[in-house]
C-alpha cells in the first residue's frame, strides 16, 4: 500500500501556540554554548523596543586617580598651591548596532502527500539548533572585526597571544595550560576574570588526546577519557570549554606556514545581547501554489563591553568588507585600554590539522 498524507497535526498547527515559541527560545539557549556558559548575557539596557537602528549607552571609564601628598603649608599638591586638584572621570558611550535577520522555509501539499511526513515539522525540530548556529556565526564575525588579522590590527588586537609556529610546530605551539597563562597575563591582574575558552574541534582533540580535558559534574571534576560529550560540561585550565567548528582557520597566513586557529578566552558576560524584537515564528498558506510557509525573524545585537560600533550605517552583515561586522574599521575602543576588556584571542597550531596556507 502506498503511503499518503492522511492529515493530522502539522507544525503549522503548533507554530502559533506560545508554548512552541517558548520551547524554541529555551532550546536556543540550550543549544548555544556561548549562552549556556554565560559568555553571552541578556542586558535590557541594550534593548531597542521603542525603535531605532542602534543603541547608545553612556558610561564612565575605569578611574586611575593620581595620589597627592598632603603636607602642612601652602605649596603641596600637584597644584603647588596647597590644595587637592579635581581630576576628571572619562565619560564616553558604547554603541551597539541592531541586526535584522530572518529566513523562510516552504513545502507544498504534494511533498506532504508523497512522503507521508510534514517537511516543516522536520524544520521545526532543528530550528533551535539552526538559529543558535547562525547567531554564533554572527558573534564570530564580530570578534574577527574586533581583533583583526593575524597581526592583530583590530581595536582588541593588543589582547592577542600568537604562539603558533611557522612551517613546523611542537607542543609549545599548541593549546596548553602554559599558553593559557600567557593569554590571562595579557590582562594582568584581571586575568582571573576569564571564565570560558572557545575553540575548533581540531584544537580540542589535542586536549582530549593528552588528557587535559576535564568533565565538570555537579561540582566535581573527572578526567575526560570518554570524549567531549560527557555528562556536564568540559573544562580546561579552570575554564569552561566551548567547541564550535565555526572557529576555523584564520585567513591571511603566510604561504607554506601551518594553519593557525583562533581561540577566544572570555570573561563572564563580556558579550551582552540587546533585543529589538524577540524571535518570531509565523506560518502562512499560499493557496494558489498549495504551499505552507514557515517564517522566522529576529532583531537583536551583540555588544562586547568596552567597545563600540563605529561604522556610519547599521544592520551590517557578517562579511569583512567596509561597514560590516568583520571589518576592523567598523569598531572602536570605548575603554581607554584594551586590557580592561576581559576578552583575549590566542592563535595556535594543532597536530590534528597539518595543512598549510596556500
Tell me what each language-model feature is.
Residues 2, 57-60, 110, 357:
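Long, position-biased, composition-driven segments near the start of the mature protein
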Residues 2-40, 162-178, 209-358:
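Sequence/fold signature of self-assembling virion shell proteins
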Residues 35-101:
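Assembly/oligomerization interface modules of large self-assembling protein complexes
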Residues 45-46, 184-188, 229-231, 282-283:
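A generic local secondary-structure boundary/capping motif
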Residues 57, 90-152, 188-201, 241, ...:
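Long, contiguous amphipathic alpha-helices that act as assembly "spine/axial" helices in icosahedral shell
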Residues 63, 203-204:
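Acidic glycine-/aspartate-rich tracts in secreted/extracellular proteins
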Residues 81-83, 87-90, 121-122, 129-132, ...:
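Glycine-rich loops and low-complexity Gly/Arg-rich segments
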Residues 107-189, 318-320, 324, 332-351, ...:
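Alpha-helical scaffold segments that mediate packing/assembly in large oligomeric complexes
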Amino acid at each position: 500500500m502506498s503511503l499518503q498524507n492522511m492529515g493530522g497535526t502539522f507544525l503549522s498547527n503548533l507554530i502559533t501556540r506560545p508554548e512552541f515559541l517558548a520551547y524554541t527560545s529555551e532550546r536556543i539557549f540550550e543549544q548555544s554554548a556561548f549562552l549556556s556558559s554565560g559568555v553571552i548575557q541578556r542586558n535590557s539596557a541594550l534593548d531597542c523596543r521603542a525603535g531605532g537602528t542602534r543603541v547608545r549607552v553612556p558610561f564612565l571609564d575605569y578611574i586611575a586617580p593620581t595620589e597627592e601628598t598632603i603636607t602642612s603649608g601652602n605649596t603641596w599638591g600637584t597644584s603647588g598651591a596647597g590644595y587637592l586638584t579635581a581630576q576628571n572621570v572619562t565619560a564616553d558611550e558604547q554603541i551597539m548596532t541592531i541586526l535584522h535577520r530572518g529566513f523562510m522555509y516552504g513545502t507544498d501539499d504534494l511533498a506532504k502527500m508523497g512522503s507521508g511526513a510534514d517537511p516543516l515539522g522536520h524544520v521545526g525540530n532543528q530550528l533551535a539548533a539552526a538559529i543558535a548556529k547562525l547567531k554564533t556565526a554572527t558573534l564570530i564575525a564580530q570578534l574577527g572585526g574586533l581583533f583583526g588579522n593575524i597581526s592583530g590590527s583590530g581595536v582588541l588586537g593588543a589582547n592577542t597571544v600568537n604562539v603558533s609556529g611557522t612551517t613546523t610546530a611542537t607542543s609549545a605551539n599548541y593549546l596548553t595550560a602554559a599558553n593559557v597563562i600567557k593569554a590571562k597575563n595579557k590582562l594582568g591582574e584581571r586575568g582571573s576574570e576569564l571564565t570560558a575558552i572557545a575553540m575548533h574541534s581540531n584544537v580540542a582533540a589535542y586536549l582530549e588526546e593528552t588528557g587535559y580535558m576535564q568533565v565538570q559534574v555537579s561540582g566535581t571534576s573527572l578526567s575526560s577519557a570518554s570524549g567531549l560529550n560527557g555528562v556536564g560540561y568540559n573544562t580546561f585550565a579552570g575554564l569552561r570549554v566551548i567547541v564550535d567548528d565555526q572557529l576555523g582557520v584564520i585567513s591571511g597566513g603566510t604561504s607554506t606556514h601551518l594553519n593557525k586557529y583562533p581561540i577566544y578566552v572570555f570573561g563572564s558576560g563580556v558579550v551582552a545581547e540587546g533585543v529589538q524584537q524577540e524571535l518570531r515564528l509565523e506560518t502562512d498558506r499560499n493557496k494558489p501554489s498549495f504551499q505552507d510557509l514557515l517564517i522566522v525573524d529576529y532583531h537583536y545585537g551583540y555588544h562586547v563591553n568596552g567597545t563600540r560600533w563605529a561604522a556610519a550605517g547599521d544592520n551590517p552583515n557578517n562579511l569583512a568588507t567596509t561597514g560590516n561586522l568583520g571589518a576592523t574599521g567598523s569598531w572602536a575602543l570605548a575603554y581607554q585600554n584594551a586590557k580592561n576588556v576581559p576578552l583575549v584571542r590566542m592563535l595556535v597550531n594543532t597536530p590534528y590539522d597539518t595543512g598549510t596556507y596556500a
